[in-house]
Swiss-Prot record:
GO terms for cellular component: plasma membrane. Residues 1-20 form the signal peptide. Residues 255-405 are cytoplasmic. It is a single-pass type I membrane protein. The gene is ifnar1a. It comes from Oncorhynchus mykiss. The chain crosses the membrane at residues 234-254. Its main location: membrane. GO terms for molecular function: interferon receptor activity. Glycans are attached at residues 27, 70, 212. This is Interferon alpha/beta receptor 1a. Residues 334-343 have a biased composition (Basic and acidic residues). Disulfide bonds join 75-83, 201-222. Residues 22-123, 126-228 form the Fibronectin type-III domain. One of its GO terms (biological process) is type I interferon-mediated signaling pathway.
Amino acid sequence: MKVGFALVLLWSLPITNVLAELPQPQNLTLLTLNTQYVLTWDWDQTTTGNSVSFTVEYMAKYKMKMKKKNWSRVCERTTRTRCDLTGSDLHYLGMYVLRVRASADGVNSDWVNKDFCPDIDASLGPPSRVELAPVGNLLDVTISDPLTSTQHSMKEHVLFLYYRILYWSRSDDPQGLKPKVLDSSNNLVTLPELEAWTWYCVMIQSRYDYYNKTSSYTEPQCMQTEGDTPYGQIFLYFLVSMMVCFLLVLLSSYAFFRFYRGLKNTFYPSIQLPAHIQEYLCDSSPGSDMPRLITADSEAELCCDKLTICPEVVLLEIHVPPPLTAPPSELEQDSGRRIRQDSGDSGIYSTEGGSAQQGRSGGEPIRRDQEVDSWQTLEQVKMEEMGRELADERDLDEGVVDICV
């Protein structure tokens, strides 16, 4: 019996050494914001490798004195070094004990405990939303309370929650180095002592003095105040509006004029078609302006033949008699009379004939050579007149005329 007991004792010693060799998690820390709680810890991965897992449990602190302790398990065999306790429904004013242990290859480490009270340890968040609105030369600031994980106001858990408001003029203090401070527990705050038509920037912080809790400030928001409008600005607005109205009227008139002109040129062009074209385009009934571009089915088709009229070529033969050597003396008076008569019929008087008449009227004798030359000149003038008349008739007769049958 003694030998067997000694063997059992020797066998249990290595197991105790193995249990003691697994270290505990270190540096338990809580990351909190309003009612969001996350427990984190440190672990040296070189001791056991990646096969280690962790278990997290919690229990109300007043139950620690009871003989039977009932722990609530949150995270079991997790490989991460953090555990989210937000969904555990921890009361904000309660006090709890959190514990963590490591497990590897069926061996567990010792538990590591940490006390936690949300009312004391949980951080306070900034306002969930901030809105600015100008009211004359003042600014209204609307502040929305910080929210819990269930989207309820934190004032349900923190009764004496209030806000610290920092505001400054952006033109006088661009960096906000010397802001004005205003504390208020109201959700609607009016900033006093502001100037009209000035830009102001605002930052807000949540505060809880009982446990000395302060949140971070919100991002700066800027808004311009209003006030009575100066007369110069009113006149400027009026002038600009008048110019805009004038330009609109001018553009509208120009557009209407262009439209009217285009419409008039389309339907009533200034250049009319010739009458001989319009009579074929318009209806033949009197007083009708309807175009007759499409022929009615009842109208008979008109067939036209092409007729060409050419002038008849007439050859004119002119025989010039030989010059007379010496006309008889008794024919001198008849020859002069014939010359004057022929000149009167043709409407053209020769120079020589005129000079001969002047010579005869003056009583000077006319030589036979001069009479012969005058007669030849008169015949030449007649032939030129007949040639020009034939040329004019030939020009008039040339052309092609179409006649509809």
